[in-house]
């Protein structure tokens, strides 16, 4: 990167390729294109300086350019070291938006890039965060706490945390007061995924959330579509691209049966696999059983199953003793946000053979091997290209509306976690119906009055579960 280039990408020469794919994606993302049409003239995000930490894909490129069309300035990094699509990053960088994302970047580079998305060329600060997993938010909040004298940058729990702490210390030494200045300028954060939302709720419970947050993940048009239908298509895509293994007839174990687990089980079942599910929640376990899946304990199937997928958002779901007991050439992968669902760190002292990018063969002393996808990180983005554009349009439309809401009406919100109102959820769904040729039935005024709603919606009470 030359001195006048405010970006880091793998190859800026891929920009034309990326631009062609962005043009195709735009035709599959009616929600985002409708946001441009509705808000492009008024530019409600004029003055917004958005720091974005979210998978740098073709679909994200359409999101970024929508934010820019609505008046925002944007700086962007990926939220995963393997999820960047280099041609997408190149196209966005070539358009003039600072982006710092390379597929296969190191953890050191990852946290350096996270730091860079808060460094504006004129020395100014961000006033909004668009996050996926919470890393950008946590980077600023941990740094500000350290500046305040809290002794929190000790005893890292993982290699990544050690690298994160080192990056924070580096910034603390270089620019005292920087983190506090950044934190105090933030009007709000919009969070994309379950893991990041959990972090925000934990901060709220402890009284440590310093600005309002919108939980985009729990918008119905995100969690019930992206998490379920997106995984339904992208999980098997990632396994196939990574391994070329036929799934029909194989035994696949899905750990977790939340929305992501439901989509993952359906994905594998649709490919002909015989799916078993592990669960800690009796409600989700009962759902899995009544959906026709055998609900098991991992220990009972670990030596007989062929494919293992974690979807829980928790840590140490598949541990070293489980992998040691697996049959030769079992496939192990994760579609939850972080890499600690599988105890990858416990595998590091074993023999690794890299087959191709994001596919490793790991051999145990007794001779059995496992195929590990994307080093335990999101395999649908590491081994493939993630969810299809159409379903991401729904998720990202929620992000755009949430950014507008917090930026323009932030004074109406306390330092708590909110969800978008149901009428906006329904609006996002409505924007995607025509693309599928779907036609809504309309309530008469009499029918609407009978069930206690307005004829144009919202059609469900806030407590309704879809």
UniProtKB/Swiss-Prot annotation:
Its EC number is 3.13.2.1. It catalyses: S-adenosyl-L-homocysteine + H2O = L-homocysteine + adenosine. GO terms for biological process: L-homocysteine biosynthetic process; one-carbon metabolic process; S-adenosylmethionine cycle. It is found in: Cytoplasm. It is an enzyme of class 3 (hydrolase). Keywords: Cytoplasm, Hydrolase, NAD, One-carbon metabolism. GO terms for molecular function: adenosylhomocysteinase activity. It holds the Pfam family AdoHcyase_NAD. Pathway: Amino-acid biosynthesis; L-homocysteine biosynthesis; L-homocysteine from S-adenosyl-L-homocysteine: step 1/1. The keyword Endoplasmic reticulum does not apply. Substrate binds at residues 57, 132, 192, 222, 226. One of its GO terms (cellular component) is cytosol. Binds 1 NAD(+) per subunit. Its cofactor is NAD(+). NAD(+) binds at residues 193-195, 227, 256-261, 279, 314, 335-337, 380. Gene3D superfamilies: Adenosylhomocysteinase-like, NAD(P)-binding Rossmann-like Domain. May play a key role in the regulation of the intracellular concentration of adenosylhomocysteine. PANTHER family: ADENOSYLHOMOCYSTEINASE. Belongs to the adenosylhomocysteinase family. This is Adenosylhomocysteinase. It comes from Sinorhizobium medicae (strain WSM419).
């Amino acid at each position: 990167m030359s001195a006048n280039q405010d970006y880091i990408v793998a190859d800026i020469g891929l920009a034309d390729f990326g631009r062609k794919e962005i043009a195709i994606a735009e035709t599959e993302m009616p929600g985002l294109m409708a946001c441009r049409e509705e808000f492009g003239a008024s530019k409600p995000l004029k003055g917004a300086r958005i720091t974005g930490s979210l998978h740098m894909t073709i679909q994200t490129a359409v999101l970024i350019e929508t934010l820019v069309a609505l008046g925002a300035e944007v700086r962007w990094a990926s939220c995963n070291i393997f999820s960047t699509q280099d041609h997408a990053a190149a196209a966005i960088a070539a358009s003039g938006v600072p982006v710092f994302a390379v597929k296969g970047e190191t953890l050191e580079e990852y946290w350096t890039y996270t730091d860079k998305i808060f460094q504006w060329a004129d020395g100014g600060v961000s006033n909004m965060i668009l996050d996926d997993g919470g890393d950008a938010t946590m980077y600023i909040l941990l740094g500000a706490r350290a500046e305040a004298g809290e002794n929190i940058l000790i005893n890292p729990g993982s290699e990544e945390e050690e690298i994160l702490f080192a990056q924070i210390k580096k910034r603390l030494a270089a620019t005292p007061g920087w983190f506090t200045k950044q934190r105090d300028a933030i009007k709000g954060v919009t969070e994309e995924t379950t893991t990041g939302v959990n972090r925000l709720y934990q901060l709220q419970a402890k009284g440590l959330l310093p600005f309002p947050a919108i939980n985009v993940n729990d918008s119905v048009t995100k969690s019930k579509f992206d998490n379920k239908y997106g995984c339904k298509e992208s999980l098997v895509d990632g396994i196939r691209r990574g391994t070329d293994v036929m799934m029909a007839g194989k035994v696949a174990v899905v750990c977790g049966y939340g929305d992501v687990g439901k989509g993952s089980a359906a994905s594998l079942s649709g490919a002909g696999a015989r799916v078993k599910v592990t669960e800690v929640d009796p409600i989700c376990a009962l759902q899995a059983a009544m959906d026709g899946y055998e609900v098991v304990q991992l220990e009972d199937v670990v030596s007989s199953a062929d494919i293992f997928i974690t979807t829980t958002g928790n840590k140490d779901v598949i541990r070293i003793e489980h992998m040691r007991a697996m049959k030769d050439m079992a496939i192990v992968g994760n579609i939850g946000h972080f890499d600690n669902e599988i105890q990858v760190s416990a595998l590091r002292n074993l023999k690794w053979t890299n087959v191709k990018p994001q596919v490793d063969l790991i051999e145990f002393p007794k001779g059995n091997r496992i195929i590990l996808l994307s080093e335990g990180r999101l395999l649908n983005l590491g081994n493939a290209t993630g969810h299809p554009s159409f379903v991401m349009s729904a998720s990202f439309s929620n992000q755009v509306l949430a950014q507008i809401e917090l930026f323009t009406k932030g004074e109406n919100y306390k330092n708590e976690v909110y969800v978008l109102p149901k009428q906006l959820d329904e609006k996002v769904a409505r924007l995607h119906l025509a693309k599928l040729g779907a036609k809504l039935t309309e309530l008469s005024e009499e029918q609407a009055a009978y069930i206690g709603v307005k004829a144009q919606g919202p059609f469900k009470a806030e407590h309704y579960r879809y």
